[in-house]
Swiss-Prot record:
Gene3D superfamilies: Cytochrome Bc1 Complex, Chain C (1.20.810.10). One of its GO terms (cellular component) is mitochondrial inner membrane. Keywords: Electron transport, Heme, Iron, Membrane, Metal-binding, Mitochondrion, Mitochondrion inner membrane, Respiratory chain, Transmembrane, Transmembrane helix, Transport, Ubiquinone. It comes from Sorex fumeus (Smoky shrew). This is Cytochrome b. Heme b b566 binds at residues 97, 196. It comes from the Eukaryota.
């Protein structure tokens, strides 16, 4: 009798995706972040569901409903902080996952990469709308500032902003629709992640060398299931440590102040994971230019496969490209730092230089360096 997992219509899909999947034998821990992102998504959906049972999306009661969750609901504080810090872990895993793709040339799987870029946009949209829901000062002013950016779009901008707000300012209608979208988007993200995996399994995984691994494949289970479980345990350890010891480390104290539309916080800034894009937005004095730069800072990822000029796929054997990659990482860390600083000298000029360097590295320096390395190898 043939094994049930190989014949049952549903088990067959699971088997070919997680058990008998032929996997390169040399993939490193950098390949763990896909499964960790899956864990993060499940944690966010489960904790979010329990939060939604007690949350009210009304401007009068939203803030107090979050307070009620933390004070009166059994382990409500734990669920709330798991959800808030789970978002931070989600973005840490996302950035490392994208960084791995850039370093090892995984972007050559075009469909997988493009779905990944779409996923990144969807997760960023979800996180932004989630940040508005507690209805603290930073929630309100963050929503006002970011939605207002759409008014930079010529001709339809002003109408578009009022359409999103559902009125003439960020108010009850805005909060209600943001809650609705924040609830539905994670399920869309889960579906997109399924498509992401579908495209990945069409080609098979890349590996650190960037070479074909068809001659040396091993089954996913037990080798990589146990490796993924170790990664998950480490992720849960870091998340629970953060939640139980310093849950507000990555948050903004301004969000513990209820909304006051008449009082603007001294420094309006988003959560830490958006600071790099926020710094790029602020580095351009023109409103429309800033919005375009903001969108392009993420959208530039979709262009990277077409700028791949090297004869090798991975950066493993390309020391000059490696140098530029780590300069890019340092540049992104600099932008993250600048995004959290006030708009004054010397932060303005540092932000502008870091923004120029970001686009220069990706669009110009990396492709030219790859051509130079090809010549070094006499190709």
């Amino acid at each position: 009798m043939t094994n049930l997992r190989k014949t049952h219509p549903l088990m067959k899909i699971i088997n070919s995706s997680f058990i008998d999947l032929p996997t390169p034998s040399n993939i490193s821990s950098w390949w763990n972040f896909g499964s960790l992102l899956g864990v993060c998504l499940i944690v966010q959906i489960v904790t979010g569901l329990f939060l939604a049972m007690h949350y009210t999306s009304d401007t009068m009661t939203a803030f107090s409903s979050v307070t009620h969750i933390c004070r009166d609901v059994n382990y409500g504080w734990l669920i709330r902080y798991l959800h808030a810090n789970g978002a931070s872990m989600f973005f840490i895993c996302l950035f490392l996952h994208v960084g791995r793709g850039l370093y090892y040339g995984s972007y050559m799987f075009l469909e997988t990469w493009n779905i990944g870029v779409l996923l990144l946009f969807a997760v960023m949209a979800t996180a932004f709308m989630g940040y508005v829901l507690p209805w603290g000062q930073m929630s309100f002013w963050g929503a006002t500032v970011i939605t207002n950016l759409l008014s930079a779009i010529p001709y339809i901008g002003a109408d578009l902003v009022e359409w999103i707000w559902g009125g003439f300012s960020v108010d009850k209608a805005t909060l209600t629709r943001f809650f609705a979208f924040h609830f539905i988007l994670p399920f869309i993200i889960a579906a997109l992640a399924g498509v992401h995996l579908l495209f990945l399994h069409e080609t098979g995984s890349n590996n650190p060398s960037g070479l074909s691994s068809d001659a040396d494949k091993i089954p996913f289970h037990p080798y990589y299931t146990i490796k993924d479980i170790l990664g998950m345990l480490l992720l849960i350890l870091v998340l629970t440590s953060l939640v139980l010891f310093s849950p507000d480390l990555l948050g903004d104290p301004d969000n513990y102040t209820p909304v006051n539309p008449l009082n603007t916080p001294p420094h309006i800034k988003p959560e830490w994971y958006f600071l790099f894009a926020y710094a790029i937005l602020r580095s351009i004095p023109n409103k429309l230019g800033g919005v375009l730069a903001l969108v392009l800072s993420i959208l530039v990822l979709a262009v990277i496969p077409f700028l791949h000029t090297s004869k090798q796929r991975s950066m493993m054997f390309r020391p000059f490209s490696q140098c530029l990659f780590w300069i890019l990482v340092a540049d992104l860390l600099t932008l993250t730092w600048i995004g959290g600083q006030p708009v004054e000298h010397p932060f303005i000029i540092i932000g502008q230089l870091a923004s120029i360097l970001y686009f220069l590295l990706i669009l110009v320096l990396m492709p030219i360096t790859s051509l130079f390395e090809n010549n070094l190898m006499k190709w």
